[in-house]
């Protein structure tokens, strides 16, 4: 299993599937369709049935039931795209066997070092096989580890018919990282009663609570005048953006929050005297606090527009997804069965809120309750991203065990 996981994973991460928020097509980048087509071929090769990919890059496939019992159809999902934070082009995965617990030099020329001093959780991986970047790209374990684990689990079940299971559906979706994954996902065609995203982090993670999420695009329209004659005429759009940001609580940012604490996050700011554009994301687990945060953003925009004149501040505020706890708690047994599967494999479940979102958050509101299971990766979205091969083995085994337990309990 280890060899197959390593072979598939290192193949998938070399396909550049970074999504693009500025694109209006789906998938937003051609690399996602490239990987989708690769997976379609491989799904057919391992013996999956009803393998399809639509024009938008959504891959679906079926592993038929091999039991006479009436077992609910379950699904496993992972996303094709990688994050926009750092390039996913020319990913060169590095394999470090029997990790010694010390610094890993990812890139000598650029002096990029993965160090337990900065990332103390590395101590947990001593003796394991780590797959890292070369220090110039992200790795793409988010979520190609999940894709790999689903592929290997399905292949294992096909080759081990003695493990009884109901009908299993798998899906690989585009554009999750920019919040569009479920937009064109056909829940009815997928046909599962429950599903799981393999999109979590370290070993044991199990999540059924997510942020409420919104995005705020703000355009500041200034007035550029020659600085020599600018008195009482110039309006500096960049300074307007700075003034806007100064009114947001400094301690309510990602770098100062944890657990159930929400935040405002300035993703990007660019511009000049004439015009500046800022993009914020707004996150909170509590719905009332979420609404308050959006109201605060809107009130700052209104106050600045009143100060600088009509049309000086343009705000586009949109909800992205909601806390899926509300939809999963009524069927909490689907979380409990994963906990049982983990314990059967000597994994202690670590149930915590997702300080982020998965396709499952939106799918749960479309009628498909979808908790999130660990994929094994650490430090997602950056050059220090890595995954332990042994964690990928465990995630694969969890998929297999969940399928077995659903059949056993009927």
From Swiss-Prot:
CDD domains: M20_peptT. Cleaves the N-terminal amino acid of tripeptides. GO terms for cellular component: cytosol. It catalyses: Release of the N-terminal residue from a tripeptide. Zn(2+) 1 binds at residues 79, 142, 199. The lineage of its organism: Bacteria, Bacillati, Bacillota, Bacilli, Bacillales. This is Peptidase T. It comes from Listeria monocytogenes serotype 4a (strain HCC23). Its cofactor is Zn(2+). NCBIfam families: peptidase-T (TIGR01882), PRK05469.1 (NF003976), PRK13381.1 (NF009920). One of its GO terms (molecular function) is metallopeptidase activity. Its main location: cytoplasm. Belongs to the peptidase M20B family. Zn(2+) 2 binds at residues 142, 177, 381. It comes from the Bacteria. GO terms for biological process: peptide catabolic process; proteolysis. Keywords: Aminopeptidase, Cytoplasm, Hydrolase, Metal-binding, Metalloprotease, Protease, Zinc. The active site is at residues 81, 176. Binds 2 Zn(2+) ions per subunit. Disulfide bonds: none annotated. Its EC number is 3.4.11.4.
């Amino acid at each position: 299993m280890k060899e197959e996981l390593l072979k598939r994973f290192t193949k998938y991460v070399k396909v550049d599937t970074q999504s693009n928020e500025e694109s209006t097509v789906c998938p937003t980048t051609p690399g996602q369709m490239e990987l989708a087509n690769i997976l379609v071929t491989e799904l057919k090769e391992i013996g999956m049935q009803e393998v399809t990919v639509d024009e938008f890059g959504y891959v679906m496939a079926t592993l038929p039931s091999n039991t006479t019992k009436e077992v609910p159809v379950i699904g496993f999902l992972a996303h094709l795209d990688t994050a926009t934070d750092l390039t996913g082009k020319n990913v060169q995965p590095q394999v470090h066997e029997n990790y010694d617990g010390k610094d890993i030099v990812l890139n000598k020329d650029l002096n990029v070092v993965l160090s337990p001093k900065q990332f103390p959780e590395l101590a947990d991986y001593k003796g394991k096989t780590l797959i890292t970047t070369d220090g110039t790209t992200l790795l793409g374990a988010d979520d190609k580890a999940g894709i790999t684990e689903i592929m290997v689990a399905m292949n294992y079940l096909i080759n081990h018919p003695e493990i009884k299971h109901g009908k299993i559906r798998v899906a690989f979706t585009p554009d999750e990282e920019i919040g569009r994954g479920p937009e064109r996902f056909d829940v009815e065609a997928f046909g599962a009663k429950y599903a799981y995203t393999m999109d979590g982090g370290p070993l044991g993670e199990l999540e059924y609570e997510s942020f409420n999420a919104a995005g705020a695009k703000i355009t500041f329209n200034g007035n550029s005048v020659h600085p020599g004659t600018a008195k009482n005429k110039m309006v500096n759009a960049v300074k307007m953006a700075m003034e806007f940001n100064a009114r947001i609580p400094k301690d309510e940012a990602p770098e100062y929050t944890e657990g159930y604490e929400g935040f405002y996050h300035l993703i990007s700011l660019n511009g000049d005297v004439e015009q500046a554009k800022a993009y914020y994301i707004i996150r909170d687990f509590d719905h009332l606090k979420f609404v308050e945060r959006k109201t605060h953003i809107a009130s700052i925009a209104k106050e600045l527009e009143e100060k600088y004149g009509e049309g000086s501040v343009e705000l586009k505020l949109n909800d992205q997804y909601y806390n899926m706890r509300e939809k999963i708690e009524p069927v909490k047994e689907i979380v409990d069965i994963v906990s049982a599967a983990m314990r059967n494999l000597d994994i202690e479940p670590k149930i915590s809120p997702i300080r982020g979102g998965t396709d499952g958050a939106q799918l749960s509101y479309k009628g498909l309750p979808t908790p999130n299971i660990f994929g094994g990766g650490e430090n997602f979205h950056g050059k220090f991203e890595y995954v332990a091969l042994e964690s990928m083995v465990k995630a694969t085994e969890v998929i297999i065990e969940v399928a077995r337990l659903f059949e056993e309990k009927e």
